[in-house]
């Protein structure tokens, strides 16, 4: 299917959304796909509210881009660092951050920039451009996915044809748009380790803030006599946690290789030097 036909199909889907329950939410993350669905919503002429749920850990320049796009900003009840102080760092298997910071309902009908092309998991999970999601507490939201079948090439062509300005993370030093780049929470455990290291290199102050927040969590757990297995493995040291999670495939492998070296190798100094952290 050509891009023009995909655009027509997307606009028809948006225009078909019932308005009996009021304004339609355009779920805006600041990423390239949300820029595309925002532009499509404008082209479709629907009554919408573009809403950005501030995760408090998006890359530098994201918030400025959100405001430049005229998108409404909703602040979380609790920011990410406070969550870490209370619950520790999220993992691939325990992602409490998503539910609390961005995956919560606002309006009963919502448009999302999900694409099956993004990952095998999404391709398996999303089969149709319309679905009903039930959130914790029983709240139901009808979700619409107008670019579900779009490829990266489709997104790139649409962005360039419509002259859409995307977030800074999508441009190289010469100002060229790179559709393969991603915008997500800095340090997200779902990203691969190389990508996470690159994100922290771009945002070293955020890494330092997360280390301090995790250290607060460890200190409280240790004082209460309730240290987690990960805390014990890391010797109650948040720098060790980040070193292990960013440079090793698992904490088990880190433990096997480095337990006897913890006090011979200054991990904190290494991390500060690697990520160019200046106090």
Regions found by a protein language model. Give the residues of each.
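ATP-dependent adenylation/nucleotidyltransferase module used to activate substrates
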Residues: 1-162, 279
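ATP/NTP-dependent adenylation/nucleotidyl-transfer catalytic domains that generate, transfer
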Residues: 22-23, 167, 171-279
